[in-house]
Amino acid sequence: MADSSFDIVSKVERQEVDNALNQAAKEISQRYDFKNVGASIAWSGEKILMQANSEERVKAILDVFETKLIKRGISLKALDAGEPQLSGKEYKIFASIEEGISQENAKKVAKVIRDEGPKGVKAQVQGDELRVSSKSRDDLQAVQALLKGQDFDFALQFVNYR
């Protein structure tokens, strides 16, 4: 019987992030507590720029955006938001979307699979993803359940299950 395998990745659909950003921008433009505070959220290159005239308002914009991301099914572990910075008369927060599994994080996941996973399961690092293979599909499902129970500081998705 051939080996079964799946890939562990950390990817975010850019379109879903864009939809969440547009929904947040619409809510910010319509909410009463954001009137006359210069509140806005928009793409700034590959980063997301949130700005308002007070620190509390810019944190509220971040909260609205996080709520929209959750509703769109995007893990907040993929969002890397900085601290509010004063720039002139406005406060700004720059946030970026983290994608890919770093070598260091891939080694952590592989170690968890080796130490706590079923015997006969192999994990190989392939660039910014991890390939997990085994003779038994049940073992692969046990590995998925194990990893879902772990609290990593990055988002994980399981793809390419064969």
From Swiss-Prot:
This is Nucleotide-binding protein SAV_4896. It comes from Streptomyces avermitilis (strain ATCC 31267 / DSM 46492 / JCM 5070 / NBRC 14893 / NCIMB 12804 / NRRL 8165 / MA-4680). Belongs to the YajQ family. GO terms for cellular component: cytosol. Nucleotide-binding protein. Keywords: Nucleotide-binding. It comes from the Bacteria. NCBIfam families: PRK05412.1 (NF003819). GO terms for molecular function: nucleotide binding.
